[in-house]
From Swiss-Prot:
Homodimer. CDD domains: NAT_SF. Keywords: Acyltransferase, Antibiotic resistance, Plasmid, Transferase, Transposable element. InterPro entries: Acyl_CoA_acyltransferase, GNAT_dom, N6_acetyl_AAC6. This is Aminoglycoside N(6')-acetyltransferase type 1. Substrate binds at W51, D154.
């Protein structure tokens, strides 16, 4: 496995993970050419349920407006496409929690904290461990940056599948928080916990 990195226009180091294992979920940076595919994914029923709800179904123009700045490295959100055996199977993103705006993580003071979100594109692939593999790949990628101290996420309390997925990937529940999207289970994985688990393995 290798991890490639580069500097963006904002001076933020972004990473892309590459592996030769055929059964691994890998991540590549999303490009402008992926936006139409992401638009189609974001309108699939199993994704709509947890990604904004029916009233937030996006148009292609919505997706282009929201995600193109990230693709062009004009903001601190890094978008990825998850791959399995050369085929795209999902989307993931990481972002700097500090100063993320719009009411998110307003009390955060540590610039090393990263937030994550992800989805699997195909309902037929749910419950097969791919989500856990995706999250683990994303966690490893992010902790390759020595400045990252903690990774956090915020699934809905009703999204039991996501909560189990995060727990299998090494996240711990830290209680319930109120976010702009409503109540959420606050889950974290610290660098210390990640390195401890990796040393045992």
């Amino acid at each position: 496995m290798s991890i490639q990195h580069f500097q963006t226009k904002l001076g933020i180091t972004k990473y892309s993970i590459v592996t030769n294992s055929n059964d691994s979920v890998t991540l590549r940076l999303m490009t402008e050419h992926d936006l139409a595919m992401l638009y189609e994914w974001l309108n699939r029923s199993h994704i709509v349920e947890w990604w904004g709800g029916e009233e937030a179904r996006p148009t292609l123009a919505d997706v282009q407006e929201q995600y193109l700045p990230s693709v062009l490295a004009q903001e601190s959100v890094t978008p990825y496409i998850a791959m399995l055996n050369g085929e795209p199977i999902g989307y993931a993103q990481s972002y700097v929690a500090l100063g993320s705006g719009d009411g998110w993580w307003e009390e955060e003071t540590d610039p090393g904290v990263r937030g994550i979100d992800q989805l699997l594109a195909n309902a037929s692939q749910l419950g097969k461990g791919l989500g856990t593999k995706l999250v683990r790949a994303l966690v490893e990628l992010l902790f390759n940056d020595p400045e990252v101290t903690k990774i956090q996420t915020d699934p809905s309390p009703s999204n039991l599948r996501a909560i189990r997925c995060y727990e299998k990937a090494g996240f711990e529940r830290q209680g319930t928080v109120t976010t702009p999207d409503g109540p959420a289970v606050y889950m974290v994985q610290t660098r210390q916990a990640f390195e401890r688990t990796r040393s045992v393995a």
